[in-house]
């Protein structure tokens, strides 16, 4: 009441239903020595969400804040843990996430109000030990043709690309639910003081943010020490403030396609319905070769005449203008992308 509801500038706009519940027996072992059960997770999610909505109906509820892919699959963390509630129904679903969404949808019907606004999961790359792996890591989020070289792939490959599978479940079991990654890092988090100062981390973050846009992610929160990662900061700024004056990637995604995602990723946008300017983010993943990217804008009635190229390179994490073209013709631009 003091701060106001979620619609005010001082109110709390969102609430998370705790954090990484299947790890409670490890992270909060004195309070919760046993692994959380399916029944406990669902009932506590409903109870807490209903309490918040009773106080502030405009607030968004985020949950269940799973630590990664495995809880989405089986609702638990330990290989030897068996939940009889989940085992009794799991044959009806592809993975545990489907069941959780079903339960929250049924809770809305019972309580007369939505009790889960945003499905929230954390994501940390499992194949990130080398530069080569980090350059491809974001593809596990959105590229159906990619298979990462991690311990997850042989056992759980059917759940990749991860964001695509999450959104498919939402669309089927609880349409209208938003998707968030309130913790994510696709770099080598344990070695970020070194990797964060390498241009590879910029390419990884750039493609990750593009994948979020491509897959309709509502909210994402980078987990790491950004003061140690100037290249990651610049990658974020490519989308939010690339000219230092507030210029940003557009809010409407334009269909784009790379001929080979192993070599280059591409994402394009416009601002609203304004097609006068197209903003494109490109990456060159080669460590040795300059890539000449030909950007062709098909299907537009506009005739584009100029282009400005901003870049992050290995020489500096600063975003700099590396090319200005005032002779664009046939809606086609060629851009030289330096190697790493």
What are these regions (language model features)?
Residues 2-3, 13, 38-200:
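Noncatalytic carbohydrate-binding groove/subsite architecture in carbohydrate-active enzymes
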Residues 7-10, 16, 54-56, 110-115, ...:
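Extracellular/periplasmic catalytic domains that process cell-envelope and extracellular macromolecules
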Residues 21-25, 68-72, 125-130, 186-193, ...:
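Flexible loop/turn segments at secondary-structure boundaries
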Residues 25-35, 75:
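Catalytic cores of eukaryotic secretory-pathway lumenal/extracellular enzymes that build
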Residues 178, 190-191, 248, 278-281, ...:
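Extended hydrophobic-aromatic, low-complexity segments
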Residues 198, 209-279, 315-319:
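Glycan-recognition and catalytic regions of carbohydrate-active enzymes
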Residues 260-303, 340:
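Carbohydrate-binding surface patches
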Residues 301-339:
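Acidic, Ser/Thr/Pro-rich beta/coil linker or hinge segments at domain junctions
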């Amino acid at each position: 009441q003091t701060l106001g509801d979620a619609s005010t500038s001082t109110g709390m706009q969102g609430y998370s239903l705790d954090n990484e519940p299947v790890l409670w027996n490890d992270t909060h072992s004195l309070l919760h020595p046993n692994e959380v059960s399916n029944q406990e997770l669902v009932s506590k999610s409903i109870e807490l969400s209903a309490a918040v909505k009773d106080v502030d109906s405009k607030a968004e509820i985020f949950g269940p804040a799973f630590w990664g892919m495995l809880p989405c699959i089986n609702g638990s963390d330990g290989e030897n843990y068996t939940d009889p509630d989940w085992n009794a129904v799991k044959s009806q679903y592809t993975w545990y996430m489907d069941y959780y969404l079903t339960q929250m949808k049924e809770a809305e019907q019972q309580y007369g109000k939505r009790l889960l606004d945003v499905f929230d999961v954390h994501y940390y790359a499992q194949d990130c030990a080398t530069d080569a792996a980090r350059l491809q890591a974001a593809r596990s989020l959105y590229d159906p043709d990619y298979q990462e070289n991690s311990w997850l792939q042989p056992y759980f490959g059917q759940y990749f690309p991860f964001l695509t599978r999450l959104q498919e479940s939402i669309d089927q079991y609880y349409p209208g639910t938003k998707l968030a990654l309130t913790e994510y890092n696709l770099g080598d988090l344990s070695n970020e003081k070194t990797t964060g100062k390498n241009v590879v981390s910029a390419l990884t973050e750039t493609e990750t943010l593009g994948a979020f846009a491509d897959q309709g992610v509502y909210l994402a929160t980078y987990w790491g020490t950004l003061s140690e990662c100037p290249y990651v900061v610049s990658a974020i700024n490519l989308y939010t403030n690339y000219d230092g004056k507030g210029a940003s990637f557009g809010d409407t995604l334009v269909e784009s396609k790379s001929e080979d995602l192993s070599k280059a990723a591409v994402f394009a946008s416009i601002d609203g319905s304004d097609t006068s300017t197209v903003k494109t983010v490109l990456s060159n993943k080669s460590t040795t070769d300059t890539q000449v990217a030909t950007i062709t804008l098909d299907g537009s009635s506009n005739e584009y005449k100029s282009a400005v190229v901003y870049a992050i390179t290995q020489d500096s994490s600063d975003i700099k203008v590396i090319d200005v073209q005032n002779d664009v013709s046939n809606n086609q631009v060629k851009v030289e992308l330096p190697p790493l």
